[in-house]
Amino acid sequence: MTPHINAPAGAFAETVLFCGDPLRAQFIAHHFLKNAQEITNVRAMLGFTGEYQQHKLSVMGHGMGIPSCSIYAKELITEYGVKNLIRVGSCGAVLDEIKLHDVIIALSAATDSNVNRLRFRHYDFAATADYSIFSALIAAAAQQNITARVGTVFSTDSFYHADTELMDLLKRFHILGVEMEAAGLFGVAAEYGARAGCILTVSDHILRQETTTALERQTRFHDMITIALEAAVRLAH
């Protein structure tokens, strides 16, 4: 056990689907996994282990922002032996061609956070998804005939900001989605010798002020969840 995870040793599978919202983790466990058991609930950050297509698989919440996500990722890797972390989350869009509920697979993550510079002794760390997980997500999307956009996302430390210059910059660099964790997750995985990937569903369009409800973000992102589950199976082979 750790200060933040009260699961016993061996409770987690080698692959964990990692959700910002612990209720999304609970939804995945209850609706997609067989024989799912709750294994951790400290601070209401729920985690479950069950089976998907006869493979042991875990799903857990990681909270909002790089600091929270990084704590759980580090502990899962170093204390529980987790090898693969797949963030299954939501994001906002700025590009005109992207719509609500579009699926995005992150190849890399830019950020306004300083955490990777601190980790990498003030040099610029290239925060990229692990190729095995990235390619498994791409293959799973193709297998399921689900269209997924692929490219760079932006991990921000500031959820509430109205920086129009930043939005223009993100559009110019063709940033597919704005979220709060991927860059930090990729950095933690690299530092501790694990693999990480990230798949997102567009829950908001920042410039068009379009949004989904909290309930929709918990329960209606089936395409993303299916891709992540099928990718986990590919990693097990």
Curated annotation (Swiss-Prot):
**Quaternary assembly:** Homohexamer; trimer of homodimers.
Q: Which reaction does it catalyse?
A: a purine D-ribonucleoside + phosphate = a purine nucleobase + alpha-D-ribose 1-phosphate; a purine 2'-deoxy-D-ribonucleoside + phosphate = a purine nucleobase + 2-deoxy-alpha-D-ribose 1-phosphate
Q: What is its EC number?
A: 2.4.2.1
Protein name, entry field: Purine nucleoside phosphorylase DeoD-type
In chain numbering, the residues marked as site (Important for catalytic activity) are 217
Q: Member of which family?
A: Belongs to the PNP/UDP phosphorylase family.
**Does the keyword Glycosyltransferase belong to this entry?**
yes
The residues listed in the UniProt record as binding phosphate, with positions renumbered to this chain, are 20, 24, 43, 87-90
Active-site residue list: 204 (proton donor)
User: What does UniProt give as GO cellular component?
Assistant: cytosol
A GO MF term: purine-nucleoside phosphorylase activity
PROSITE patterns per the UniProt record, alphabetical: PNP_UDP_1 (PS01232)
Q: Which HAMAP family match?
A: Pur_nucleosid_phosp (MF_01627)
Q: GO annotations under biological process?
A: purine nucleoside catabolic process
What is the main EC category here?
transferase
InterPro entries documented for this protein: DeoD-type, Nucleoside_phosphorylase_CS, Nucleoside_phosphorylase_d, Nucleoside_phosphorylase_sf
Q: Which domain of life is it from?
A: Bacteria
- For a purine D-ribonucleoside, which residues are the binding ones? 4, 179-181, 203-204
Q: Which gene name belongs to this protein?
A: deoD
Record-linked NCBIfam families? deoD, PRK05819.1, PRK13374.1
Q: Which keywords annotate this record?
A: Glycosyltransferase, Transferase
